[in-house]
Amino acid sequence: MTKKYLSLLLFTVLCLTINAQTYQKSTAAAASFTINSDSTATVLEWFNFIEGKGLVLSYTSTHVNLQEKVKVKQDTYSIQNLLSSVLAGYDFETSFLQNKILLQIKGLKRFHVSGCVYDQKTKEPLEGCIVVFMNKNQRQYAAVTDYKGVFHKELPSEPSYLNASYIGYEPSIRVFMTGKYQNIGIGMMQTAIPLNEVKVMNSPMSDVVNYRGASSMLSVNSNDPFAQINTLPGIYGSSVGGGMHVNGGQDDENLILLDGISIYHSHHNNTLLSQFNGETVEKVSFFDSFIPAQYEGRLSSVTDVRIKMGDFTDHHQSIGLDLPSASLTLDGPIIKNKLTYMISGRHSWIDFMKDLFSDNASASRAFNDLTGKLHYRINPKLAVEGLIYHSKDEYKDSINQIHNHKILGWENSLYSVSSHADLPRGISNISSVSLSKYSNSIYGPAINIPSDIFINEGMTKISVKSNFSKEVDKYMNLSWGLSMGHEKYNLLASQDAVKNNNQKITQVSSYINSRIKITDKLSGSVALNLVSYLPKNSKSYFSMQPRFTLKYAADEKNIISLDFSRMEQFYHNVCVGEIPIPTDLRMPSINGFKPSSSIHGELGWKRMDDNWRFSLSTYYKRRYNILGIRYDISNTGYEGWDRFIMKGNAESYGVKVHSMNQWNKWRLNCSYTFSKSVEWFEDYKNNKKNPTLHDVPHLFHCATSYMVGKDSFLSLGGYIKSGSLYNVYNEEGNISGQFISHRERRKINYRLDANFSDSITPQKQHLKFSYKVGLYNIIGNPKEDEIIDLYSIDTKKHCLPYFSLNIKF
């Protein structure tokens, strides 16, 4: 009986204890708060408000911003609901004990948002689309889609909506549904009037131009994909037939790719002519600081031009008439939603009318090119493409009493087949097989060779590439690949000789590149490129080229970056004159001509606002084993390149500033570069450092456009730059053949251009007119080659009026 009473007593005590604990818990948990009107206060002030009701909050402030202002709407709240409103962006847990609240704040909530952006009509992914996320407090975060149109972003707060923007497409705004943040599909519609502009992506800070730049408006061509690149800081354009000097480098140190396939000499015989037909270009990626590991073979920059495919559902035609050339472009489906075509051709036309414009009726420059692409979508995970490109440049003049005789010419050809596949385990692959050719010829008598023959030189390359990529997780993305190429050089045996010398070279390379998200604010890429260079009859070389970049996002608008790249170049091209000819030095790394190499470091800061982008960077570049022409000796009677070419080193450094603004109806694009470029050679002036011929200490570009109407713009812009250097030398005597030489700087170069552009859409929506009328060199003192190469047009004060027209139907 005693045991029975004891058991009953223990049960009663236990029930009372549980009831007391429940009462203690419910004392705090049952508290309610009435907010009479919408109120905004800091987190700390809201905590004080809760404690003012007789409750005790116990928390640590390590993972919460007590000064953040939070708005709470008018209502009656339980303690749990009020804390959920005040700490809406945080992960936290609560427990209650009498009038005490134990608050465990774990940190900010993380929302992983992902999706794909594509063309609503063709279903093609849109690479480089900017996706901006905004939360309820109007804070913005941005992401950029990859080549598959996919984006990923970790957000510190719940997004309310996103805004996707892409060149030539209407902006797409998407409101988020609560909890649905993954695998978002965003279809975008093209604008009624195409913007006629490609996207330019510029390393080191992924500068994606998402509106029509003022500098692009000033191009003489109706659609010039390189107009904006030529005005970027650190870039100094060279003369006709040449390329550009990037960060103090030579013009043979820039790699030009067409759909990932190298082009030996993509430039044409006129500075006003775009390298490629803008109607065929989808996008241009330009790298001059951190160069991704899949690119190799040049020291200073890489320009990767991607050719667009045809429309999957409708046929389109485009006719263009510019000052340099006329063009025709056709594209559309062969099998709807399966097989498309795109074909485009350009041809110079002023050479047909040269008699009306030139004092010398027999001198002319002719040009034509052809670009074509087939795209076959086998299934959603596999597609095959075929690309063809051919260009031809000629210069004709009177010689040996023969009028309109071909003097000089060069040709480029490229053929490739590629596949794009999504493999198992999230791996993507792009593989290609390609054939590229370059040939150059000059009429013998034009260079004092009496034989009535053409001197020819050229190169042929067959290559196989396979690139892979995989998103390992939200913190790492890996890419790797392997390529093999076989080159055949048809070289002149010597600078004066007509005989050719064939050289065969095999090159094998591999790379790995990892993009890593270290923290929410710190990310980077580490890459390595390995090359085996295997000439048939000369010394072999093995190259290791490490590269890395580090980016720190101080906040949503400011990015600090640090880049390093080591590059190696196995191809040398030294031009004796302004225009490339077969007797120039074109030499692979054989017969004692070692590879050139470079190291490049750059520290940059970039600020991105809604309508303003600003970047500032400083760089240092060191180049080893570069080649130069000796101007202090005569080449009379010379039978080889050895005494005519110098080998040495060079360095360059500078500061680059770039600003792009857009407000109301105005657009402004400005860039400034301060730089120094020097070189030194063992066989020249006792190895003393001397400014390079392309040393331009100050270079300023500026262009502005005013939106007169919906698609009408009035643009004004130009440049001011230090004059470049040139060699001055006089022969001392005929016996020694020695020269006394020094370098002098030309006068300051400047130029001012203006134009008006407009687009008109008649009632028939399938017909669109775009035109441009302007003045080239209204006032100025440009380099002489910018004037004499205007298709031999001679105008007073060299002010050239121009007109371009583009019709789409």
Which residues does each predicted region cover?
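Surface-exposed extracellular loop regions of Gram-negative outer-membrane beta-barrel proteins
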Residues: 439, 534, 538, 552-601, ...
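Flexible loop and strand-edge segments within Gram-negative outer membrane beta-barrel domains
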Residues: 350, 383-461, 495-503, 580-582
